[in-house]
Structure formats: structure tokens, C-alpha cells
């Protein structure tokens, strides 16, 4: 008997073919395996076919991800041996490209073994680890189709590459010091200071001296410095133009990390996972300079994920700040020449290598929210693995996402391929980067969209781009309301097929009525939605300025409550400015209405005198989250009239609360009570939580606790971010409803 199999999934570049080869040999089966653009095809014949099928799925390599298996039985054709055939490049692009994966333990042992030929070699990898997504130029995933094509393997590497019993069998980035990429160190003037081990040692010495070094990694450059050196960290802030936004810190090991932070068991597992994300963890007080994460209880911590990181940290006694190599709000730098031009104004030295990065890919960020890992940024280690839809699409869809924390998606059948993190598409550089990344992903999959979907906001650069693209290609353009897309995203990733109550809370999103939404209760299914409840709208004095200045939102709420008398409150404005802002508010000049819960967090933070200006998105909310005390059980009053949730009594209670330290807890408890109250009124069992506010751990935990004990099923995000980084999935899901 013969069996013909077709496997779709992330099975290329993970040691899958050698695994199948060894399994077939062990079971005395004959036939072949081949990589194709559709995935992997296998034909085997012999006696132990059922055992083969069972073990194929149970014992597959750790990184292999099987999306689907189809097989059929046939007559034997008389194969005499089992072989690995040459790959085919024709056909449609169905293969799942694997993300870049952190260095495995076996490779690490070799890097630090003085007797090994790869001792201290920064580009050591195998089929279980190393770069994938950032080096592949086209499918199928074979060495000539990667940026490793310029490095001809030496005899020893070639022998490993061709040996089906070796873990480097068909490891496309396989290399060693003799034949592979090398590192080079330059000063900011572009003069070469050293290469190889000397380059690394000079870079390490510079870090010890308090200098800043740009280091080329897997998906772009990092800017690194001694994380315990306050002066170095402050210098990096000034040069990078990053006032207070937290820096990530890389530790050499979990053991070292525990001297500075308190990870839970789940957070430890996330830190050590093959994806190696940055994980937001509670820090040990005063263990690191306050300037790393000013005013916050958590730090973004991560472990090394490339041999180069491990080598650098092995020769340092301290953790390092490792932040993206760019100016604030610009795309991460990935090319050597660009680094020498751009990063020389930030870094004192630049450590490059000569393996080209095909596409930039930032570090991923994860936070445990409500006891579940939530992706704050889905990028390296996760992208571009697809998310499965509950239904099949009839058309090929391109979704352009939102403006902030942008990701986009291409989708067909039941698969949504979400891009790596693009960033905030607010300037020319990020828009250009967005466009390059869209065309790159479409080209990689030979994808021609038949429908484009975007956000409804007329001023989003991604919306304007989608309009231009749809006209140029003469294909339909669909616009989806921002908060509906948030809830659709949560529904799609959880495989929900029926109606839900969606609670979409965030900073801002363009509403159907032309106002800014952000405190929404929506009854949703894939075909349509209804806005059933929302927070009472208030004016954002000065529009965009109010988003960056919580004191303006606080003033707006006080004016709603007290009218002109609010000007007599002790407010962080001079009298002249106050009177001008009152005029602007009363006449509605550049002061759009908003129902945003994110802005309510800003206002409360300002009313408490904690924060009047936000230096980065979500800063006030993060501070209030850190001040939450689970021992505080009570909440403030609120009222619901018609469809409107009135926050005015809540704000009055806050103003009269003499226990100021309990205000953040009582405010968060109030929001959870409102969620329960509305859920009961609507009466739909399934409740989806989405939007940037749902990154708040105590808030989500409290909402889940309240709703679950009252019989509701609560769904949150795990596969895509709850912030605008998950919008593109919701935009794709919207197309399901149309068909």
C-alpha cells in the first residue's frame, strides 16, 4: 500500500524533511518528500503506514506547525529507497513562512564550547533556530532564495547541510567562521575599527565605558548601553529624542533577570520561549535607574535571541538597554549604510554584519493581562504565521489596518497573514516603510488583492493609501468602523460564529456620526453591528492637543460639570490660557466630541495631579494601572440614561474622595461595574473585550471576574494585539459578513 500526503503549515526550514527521512528509514518505508510552494508533499509505501501517520504528527520537530494534512491511499509503485527530492518553485504560494526564532540550547552549547568549530561565532544556527522571515527573498525557502546565497558553504558546512541525520540538514542560513557572515565595527565617522572577535570586544569595552553602541541584529539595529549606568541611559534618551517612553532591557539569563525583576512562572515561560519576546514584568524597586521606565512599576525585559547577543552579554556583568535603532517614531534601521548615516548621530560606535536583512522586524512585546499572555506588539517570533478565520473568504483581501501601532494583512481562504509591526503611520518615513512592507509581503506570496479594506477615518494615512491603491488597481474599497473592527478581530481570532456584545474601549476612533468614539458597547456579528450603549461624549479641547495633554480633558470634564465656575479650580494653566480654552470649549472650536474611556483615564490622572502631559501614548493609563490595589473593593456612582453612560457622578465622587491613593482602584472598579451592568441589560452570553484600554491588567481581570461569575463567556485577544495592531484582522473579518 502507498500513501500520498500533502501537508500545509510551517514545515520548511524546521528540520521537517530530515525528520520524515529518519522516520521512514526507521519504519522501513520507501518513497520521497519534497518542499513545494503549497507546503510539503510526501509519498511512502510499505507495511507501517498507520504508525508513520501517527508518529508524523506526534513526534514532529518542535518548531513545525501543521495547519492541515490531506492524504489518500494508492497502489504501490515499487519505490526502492526513501529520498529527499529537489524543491519546486512553480505553483501558488500556500507555504507558511516561519518567523525568526531564538537561538536553541544545542547551538548555544557550541557557541560557548572552546573545542567547537563555531566557538564564539555570532551566526550559529540550525533547523531549530535562527533567522527565517528576515532573510527569505522568495519561495520556496531554499538557500539560493535567501540573503545567505552570497555565502558559499565550506566543505564541513556542506557535509552537515547534506546529511539527513544532522540537525543542520537543509538549514538554509547554515554557516561557520570559515564561510559565513562576519561582524565589523565602525566609529561614527565611518572608519573601520576592527572585525570578528576584535570588533565585538571593542564594542563591549565601549559599553563598559558608558558609551552607546548600535548593533545589527536579526530584524534591524538595536541601540545598546549599560542599563545600570544612569548617565548612559539619559544620553541615549536625549540623542534618540525619546523623553519618557520606557526602554527595553536585555538580560544574559533568567538568573540575572531575577536580580532586577519579579517574573511569574508564566512570564518566565514567555521569556524563554522560542519567540523570545519582550515581556512586561514587575521590577525590583531601585534595582535599575528610574530613567529606564520613568514612573512605572514594570520594565520591558527580554533574553538574548541571537548568538551575537549572547556573546556580548557573556562578557558583561550588567544587563543592557536594547532599544530599536531609530529616532523616535521612525522605522527601525536595517541596512549598514543607513546605520552609518542615521545612527552615527545617536551611537558612538556601530557594530554591523554582512548578512543582509531582507525585511525589518521589530521585537515583539507581550504582557500578561487577566492571566493570559497578550501581544502588545506582534512582530519578531510571531509574524508572519497566519491566523485562521472561522469561515472561508471568497476573495483575496488586503487590509491596511489603522494609523497607530500599524500592522496590515493579506488574506485568502481561511488564512490571514498579518505583517510584522510597522509603527505609527504619521509621517513620510513610516508611510514609505508601510508601502514597502505591503508590496514586499504581496510579492513574497505572489498575492494580488481583489478587495481592499481600511479604517473609516478620512485622515488616516493608511486610509488615503488604500483609496489610492484601490483606484490604481480598479478594485473595490471597503471602509470599516474602527471599534467594530476591534470586536470583529476578537471574534475572528476566537473562532466565534454567533452574535456577541463587544466592549471596545480605546483612546480614539472615527465614529459613524463623525465624532470620536472610544467607550463603546456594540452588538456585533460579521454582517453588521449596532451601537447599543456608549459613554457620554465630552469635548477634546484643541483636538489632537488634548490627546497629548490630559489636563485639557480634565478641564473639559470640569466645564461640563460646573460651567465657567470650573475656571476657579486649582488647575495647571495660567489664567490667560484658561480663559482662552474656555472660549474654545464653549464655541466648540477645534474641540470634537469624544466618548473615549482612554481619555477618561487621562483626565483622572490629571485631576489627581499625577500627570498633566502625556509624553507617549497611554502613559497616564499605565500610571493609574500601577496604582491599582486589589484590596480596594468599592466603586463610584454612575448613571445610565437611554443609551448614554454618564460619567459625571463618577467624576464628582473622585473630586470629593479624600482617600486619593484609592481613586485609581475605585475608578477601575467603576468601569468593571459598568461593563457588568450593560452586559446584563443587553443579555448576550458572549462578550468580547477589545481596544487599547483592554491592555490594562487590573481592569480586564476585574471585568472578567464580574462577568464570569454572572454567567457570561468573556473573550479577549491572544493571537493579535487588542490595540490597533489587531485592527487589520477585524477588517478582513468584515469581508466574511459580505459573503
Regions found by a protein language model. Name each.
Residues 172-173, 180-182, 402-440, 461, ...:
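A contiguous, well-structured pocket-lining segment that forms one wall/lid of small-molecule binding clefts
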Residues 212, 220-283:
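A phosphate-binding glycine/aspartate-rich beta-alpha loop in the early core of alpha/beta enzymes
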Amino acid at each position: 500500500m502507498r500513501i500520498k500526503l500533502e501537508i500545509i503549515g510551517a514545515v520548511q526550514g524546521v528540520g521537517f524533511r530530515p525528520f520524515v527521512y529518519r522516520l521512514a528509514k526507521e519504519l522501513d518505508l520507501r518513497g520521497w518528500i519534497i518542499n513545494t510552494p503549497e507546503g510539503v508533499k510526501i509519498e511512502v509505501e510499505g507495511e507501517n503506514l498507520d504508525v508513520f501517520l501517527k508518529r508524523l504528527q506526534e513526534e514532529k520537530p518542535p518548531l513545525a506547525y501543521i495547519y492541515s494534512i490531506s492524504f489518500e491511499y494508492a497502489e504501490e509503485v515499487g519505490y526502492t529507497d526513501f529520498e529527499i527530492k529537489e524543491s519546486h518553485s512553480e505553483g501558488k504560494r500556500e507555504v507558511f513562512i516561519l518567523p525568526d526564532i531564538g537561538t536553541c540550547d544545542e547551538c548555544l552549547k557550541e557557541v560557548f564550547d572552546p573545542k567547537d568549530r563555531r566557538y564564539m561565532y555570532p551566526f550559529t544556527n540550525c533547523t531549530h533556530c535562527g533567522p527565517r522571515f528576515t532573510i527569505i527573498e522568495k519561495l520556496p525557502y531554499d538557500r539560493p532564495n535567501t540573503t545567505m546565497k552570497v555565502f558559499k558553504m565550506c566543505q564541513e558546512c556542506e557535509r552537515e547541510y547534506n546529511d539527513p541525520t544532522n540537525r543542520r540538514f537543509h538549514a538554509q542560513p547554515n554557516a561557520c567562521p570559515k564561510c559565513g557572515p562576519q561582524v565589523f565595527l565602525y566609529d561614527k565617522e565611518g572608519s573601520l575599527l576592527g572585525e570578528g572577535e576584535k570588533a565585538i570586544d571593542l564594542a563591549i569595552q565601549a559599553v563598559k565605558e558608558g558609551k552607546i553602541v548600535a548593533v545589527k541584529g536579526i530584524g534591524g539595529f538595536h541601540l545598546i548601553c549599560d542599563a545600570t549606568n544612569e548617565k548612559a541611559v539619559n544620553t541615549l534618551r536625549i540623542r534618540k529624542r525619546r523623553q519618557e517612553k520606557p526602554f527595553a532591557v536585555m538580560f544574559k539569563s533568567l538568573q540575572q533577570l531575577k536580580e532586577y525583576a519579579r517574573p511569574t512562572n508564566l512570564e518566565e515561560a514567555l521569556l524563554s520561549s522560542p519567540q523570545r519576546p519582550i515581556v512586561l514584568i514587575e521590577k525590583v524597586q531601585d534595582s535599575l535607574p528610574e530613567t529606564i521606565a520613568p514612573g512605572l512599576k514594570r520594565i520591558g525585559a527580554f533574553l538574548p535571541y541571537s548568538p551575537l547577543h549572547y556573546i556580548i552579554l557573556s562578557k558583561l556583568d550588567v544587563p543592557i538597554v536594547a532599544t530599536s535603532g531609530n529616532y523616535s517614531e521612525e522605522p527601525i534601521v536595517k541596512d549598514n549604510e543607513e546605520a552609518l548615516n542615521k545612527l552615527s548621530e545617536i551611537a558612538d560606535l556601530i557594530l554591523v554584519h554582512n548578512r543582509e536583512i531582507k525585511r525589518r522586524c521589530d521585537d515583539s512585546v507581550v504582557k500578561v493581562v487577566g492571566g493570559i499572555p497578550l501581544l502588545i506588539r506582534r512582530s519578531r517570533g510571531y509574524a508572519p504565521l497566519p491566523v485562521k478565520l472561522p469561515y472561508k473568504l471568497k476573495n483575496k483581501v488586503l487590509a491596511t489596518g489603522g494609523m497607530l501601532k500599524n500592522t496590515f494583512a493579506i488574506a485568502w481562504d481561511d488564512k490571514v497573514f498579518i505583517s510584522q509591526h510597522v509603527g505609527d503611520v504619521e509621517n513620510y518615513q513610516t508611510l514609505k516603510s508601510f508601502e514597502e512592507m505591503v508590496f514586499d509581503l504581496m510579492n513574497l506570496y505572489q498575492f494580488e488583492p481583489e478587495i481592499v479594506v481600511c479604517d473609516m477615518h478620512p485622515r488616516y494615512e493608511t486610509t488615503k493609501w488604500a483609496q489610492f491603491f484601490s483606484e490604481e488597481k480598479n478594485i473595490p474599497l471597503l471602509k470599516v468602523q474602527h471599534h467594530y473592527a476591534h470586536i470583529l478581530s476578537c471574534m475572528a481570532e476566537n473562532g466565534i460564529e454567533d452574535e456577541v456584545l463587544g466592549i471596545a474601549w480605546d483612546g480614539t476612533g472615527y465614529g459613524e456620526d463623525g465624532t470620536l468614539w472610544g467607550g463603546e458597547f456594540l452588538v456585533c456579528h460579521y454582517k453588521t453591528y449596532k451601537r447599543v450603549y456608549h459613554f457620554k461624549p465630552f469635548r477634546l479641547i484643541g483636538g489632537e492637543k488634548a490627546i497629548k495633554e490630559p489636563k485639557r480633558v480634565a478641564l473639559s470634564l470640569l466645564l461640563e460639570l460646573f460651567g465657567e465656575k470650573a475656571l476657579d479650580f486649582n488647575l495647571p494653566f495660567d489664567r490667560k490660557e484658561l480663559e482662552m480654552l474656555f472660549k474654545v470649549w464653549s464655541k466648540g472650536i477645534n474641540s470634537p466630541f469624544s466618548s473615549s474611556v482612554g481619555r477618561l483615564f487621562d483626565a483622572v490622572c490629571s485631576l489627581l495631579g499625577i500627570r498633566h502631559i502625556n509624553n507617549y501614548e497611554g502613559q497616564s493609563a499605565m500610571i493609574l494601572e500601577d496604582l491599582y490595589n486589589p484590596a480596594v473593593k468599592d466603586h463610584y456612582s454612575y448613571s445610565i440614561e437611554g443609551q448614554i453612560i454618564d460619567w459625571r457622578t463618577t467624576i464628582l465622587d473622585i473630586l470629593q474622595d479624600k482617600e486619593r491613593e484609592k481613586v485609581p482602584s475605585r475608578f477601575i472598579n467603576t468601569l468593571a461595574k459598568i461593563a457588568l451592568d450593560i452586559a446584563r441589560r443587553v443579555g448576550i452570553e458572549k462578550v468580547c473585550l477589545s481596544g487599547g484600554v483592554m491592555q490594562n491588567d487590573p481592569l480586564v481581570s476585574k471585568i472578567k471576574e464580574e462577568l464570569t461569575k454572572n454567567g457570561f463567556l468573556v473573550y479577549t485577544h491572544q493571537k493579535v494585539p487588542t490595540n490597533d495592531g489587531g485592527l487589520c484582522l477585524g477588517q478582513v473579518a468584515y469581508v466574511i459578513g459580505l459573503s
